[in-house]
């Protein structure tokens, strides 16, 4: 029975009764109060008996979540086991918005002049590439119990799965993929947050420099071009101020300065650096641009420490 405080759609609601009376074992995948999917649990013949004895050893469907740090210069993605919270894979890419401006002010001005669509589209494309790469890496990180699934796939598919597990070509329906990601949590500074969502950054470049959206958001990932499970969620943490964004909110959640007796200082050093000072009695936050120091912005000589940089050494010959 679906409780009144549980949200789902008519397709899943109609499937619940059919699958409840079938002989197969099913897992209900939900986040908070929303049912997202029903997946078969690949189990042995004694699965029902084992489940009654609370010693169930069936192979559950894959369940991933992902975390995206949308930085001004670098975008980093983490793939996590949705049941244990274990980090399974990490992947990073350069932020393609750099071609439209090295810092948030330049990008905001570009968006005001040319629109937000180009900046939104390019960063969503790279996030999808990161998620795809993470799912490929997960194929090597997760132990797949092929023996328990052998009755669910043909011998041909089994051989392909074994090859995929060994890092070779080949795949099958139950191998890890982006469709097994049910939630993506995304953080970034306020400008990156707005440009990702396609929101005008005008409020950030004019006084009083306030974000257009401050509260946390739970959205349907597909509505914003993020390719995960078709009903997967996109979670964005709240922005604090015009240049203190959701990435700082993530730091606060991790460090919990608001619960400490002693005064602590948190530094998030990047192209835009944020600082929070305080304890459980109060917190103060500020930000400052660090691009010139760490990213090589507006320097006359030299370059950023990129992977493909070259060092030249000049030797002096004695006269």
Describe the role of every protein-language-model region:
Residues 44-56, 136-176:
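Intrinsic disorder/low-complexity segments
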Residues 111, 235-239, 291-299:
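Short beta-alpha connecting loops at secondary-structure transitions
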Residues 5, 55, 95, 109, ...:
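Detector for Asparagine
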Residues 1-67, 72-74, 84, 121-124, ...:
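Nucleotide/phosphate-binding catalytic cleft detector across ATP-hydrolyzing
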Residues 115-130, 134-135, 302-319:
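Conserved catalytic alpha/beta cores of large enzymes that bind or transform nucleotide phosphates
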Residues 3-5, 9, 101, 111-115, ...:
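Alpha-helix initiation/capping motif
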Residues 102-116, 228-235:
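Gly-rich Lys/Arg/Thr-decorated short loops/hinges at beta-loop-alpha junctions or inter-strand turns
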Residues 71-72, 77-105, 203-216, 250, ...:
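Glycine-rich phosphate-binding loop of actin/hexokinase-like ATP-binding domains
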